[in-house]
């Protein structure tokens, strides 16, 4: 949502549909979902007069966000949500590695009182050594892993109990077999699964995630994006959603297929997703 009230309204709608776990973002990651700096300023101003820094005259096109203004707005968002909705609903927030490690540590400490289900991706993979300091200063549960590509990234975090949820992208780490090994290793160390399931994952990937969920005693939660009619038309066997739970069918294998003839009706469109063109107020390119 664009402000606390809009986020609250959207959560209430999800609660009426039966959802018990909701990821809460004000704007997109880092609070930005547009390259219109005036609109960003207006959105943040709604969050109790938080103003982003000004940009230079000849700013480069991109999705602008102010990490400092964002970090100030997040605790105020969850203060509003807990006051209005209480503690019977579980909240998640995704930092998307868009702040400095020190800011992430401070954010995790500040959010403790709001009892998040977890804080997602507080630091980038190249900054995972900072998680030790974060863990020493905050009890906010941490989820990480969607950008990991090899065992040397996730193993030390699990060995040293620096994360609570592992959320790798299954195909990126090698597929179902490596992911199952990771799930078992995580189970031995008290870490639960939360496989990456963004809106751009295929229904085949969604089914792979869910079969891993069903076979893992340490299942934590599954990120899930609702599927439109076109996807259900092209991929017969898509999971069904009912009151916040996702259901697989009992067909062989992953239980899903692809109709290539129907897929041909939906040609790919080129272009760069605008949200990946992230920039800080002075125009510096940032990770998406």
Please report, for each region that a protein language model flagged, where it lies by residue.
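Shared catalytic-loop signature of beta/alpha-barrel
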Residues: 109, 115-118, 124-252
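Short, electropositive, low-hydrophobicity segments enriched in small/polar residues
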Residues: 31, 149, 248, 257-259
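Metal-dependent enolase-superfamily TIM-barrel catalytic cores that perform enediolate-based chemistry
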Residues: 1-132
């Amino acid at each position: 949502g664009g402000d606390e009230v809009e986020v609250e309204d959207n959560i209430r709608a999800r609660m009426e549909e039966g959802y018990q776990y909701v990821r809460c973002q004000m704007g997109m990651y880092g609070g930005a979902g547009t390259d219109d700096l005036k609109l960003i300023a207006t959105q943040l101003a709604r969050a109790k007069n938080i103003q982003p820094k000004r940009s230079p005259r000849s700013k480069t096109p991109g999705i602008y966000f102010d990490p400092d203004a964002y970090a100030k707005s997040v605790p105020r968002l969850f203060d509003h949500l807990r006051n209005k909705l209480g503690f019977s609903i579980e909240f998640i927030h995704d930092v998307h590695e868009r702040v400095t490690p020190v800011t992430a540590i401070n954010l995790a400490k500040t959010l403790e009182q709001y009892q998040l289900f977890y804080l997602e991706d507080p630091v980038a993979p190249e900054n995972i050594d900072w998680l030790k300091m974060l863990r020493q200063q905050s009890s906010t549960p941490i989820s990480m892993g969607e950008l990991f590509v090899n065992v040397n990234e996730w193993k030390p975090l699990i060995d040293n109990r620096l994360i609570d949820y592992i959320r790798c992208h299954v195909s990126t780490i090698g597929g179902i077999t490596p992911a199952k090994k990771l799930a078992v290793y995580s189970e031995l160390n008290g870490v639960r699964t939360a496989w990456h399931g963004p809106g751009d994952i295929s229904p085949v990937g969604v089914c792979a995630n869910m079969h891993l969920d069903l076979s893992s005693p340490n299942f934590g939660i599954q990120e899930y994006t609702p599927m439109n009619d076109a996807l259900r038309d092209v991929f017969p066997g898509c999971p069904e959603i009912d009151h916040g739970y996702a259901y697989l069918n009992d067909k062989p294998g992953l239980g899903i297929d692809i109709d290539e003839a129907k897929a041909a009706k939906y040609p790919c469109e080129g272009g760069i997703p605008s949200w990946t063109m992230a920039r800080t107020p002075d125009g510096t390119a940032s990770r998406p």
